[in-house]
Amino acid sequence: MSIRPLHDRVIVKRKEVETKSAGGIVLTGSAATKSTRGEIIAVGKGRILENGTVQPLDVKVGDIVIFNDGYGVKSEKIDNEEVLIMSESDILAIVEA
């Protein structure tokens, strides 16, 4: 299945988080926090401004981002993989190598 976000929304695949503590203890359950980093796998066409023009997004497919995992972020399963649907405004930063 393919998914195409609308307007200023993006689809993010969450990056796996390290599940061991600094001391080598394996973290499980609530002790293992979910990562707030992910890879952009799809982007919408952009935000529609009041004058009707479309402002393109600053992020692109393949970007690694840090995002706010809050109220506006929707989790969905696509082809048995969890993806996150969010607005570009939920993205805090692009990780540059």
From Swiss-Prot:
One GO MF term: protein folding chaperone
Record-linked Pfam families: Cpn10 (PF00166)
Transmembrane segments: none
UniProt keyword rRNA processing present: no
Source domain of life: Bacteria
CDD domains tied to this protein: cpn10
Gene3D superfamilies the record matches: GroES chaperonin
GO (cellular component) term, any one: cytoplasm
Single Gene Ontology BP annotation: chaperone cofactor-dependent protein refolding
InterPro entries from the UniProt entry: Chaperonin_GroES, Chaperonin_GroES_sf, Chaprnonin_Cpn10_CS, GroES-like_sf
Keywords from the UniProt entry: Chaperone, Cytoplasm
Family label: Belongs to the GroES chaperonin family.
Subunit structure: Heptamer of 7 subunits arranged in a ring. Interacts with the chaperonin GroEL.
NCBIfam families: PRK00364.1-1, PRK00364.1-2, PRK00364.2-2
Function: Together with the chaperonin GroEL, plays an essential role in assisting protein folding. The GroEL-GroES system forms a nano-cage that allows encapsulation of the non-native substrate proteins and provides a physical environment optimized to promote and accelerate protein folding. GroES binds to the apical surface of the GroEL ring, thereby capping the opening of the GroEL channel.
Protein name listed in UniProt: Co-chaperonin GroES
Organism field: Enterobacter sp. (strain 638)
Gene that encodes it: groES
